[in-house]
Amino acid sequence: MYHCHIHFYLTGEACGVFDSIKVLPVQEHFTHEFSESRVVEKALVEKADVILANLQNMEVKKTLGLLLEAKSEKAELIVLAAQEQMTLLTDSLSMLKDIWLLPMQEEEIHFRLLRWQQTYQMSKDFWEASHFLDSTINYIPSLIWYKDKNGIHEKVNDSFCKTVNKTKKQVEGRGHAYIWDVEQDDPACIESERIVMEKRE
């Protein structure tokens, strides 16, 4: 089982969300650490796994620019903003984990923190399960592959890649013809897969 240490960085004016996350019950296999500053501090942004930034009474574009430039690729950025600040966030939406509109009632704060916590744990559980699966199938010398109903390879093992002389990045998300360097997918292969799916065997 994994252990996950989460470093939270809280920046901007102190608010109810900051108070609530500090007393959020810690889930099994997780630990929490908090850093906090009124104005953005690059060193704290760089260390953070999760950033909650209260943009009220701050220069939105400047603050967002500092946060997005300094944060790690995997760090999640949740911004707290007033409704009238939404138009200033438009250019950055794809880089934000979420936007929480202020003011929020205590019940909504609790709901949002709980939902974030569940989603975060789910991502770590998925990472662990994926790691277990990869370790298992890569230990097996036989060719192993998982395909969707359209014949697209979703996951393959190392032996498969070695046989087709392609990387996983090249193979996953592609069909039979590309992987095996043939002009078109084998009709017999497509038919046999269709029969298996219909019979569910």
Located regions from the model:
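N-terminal membrane insertion elements
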Residues: 2-123, 127
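PAS/LOV-family and closely related PAS-like sensory domains
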Residues: 31-34, 143-201
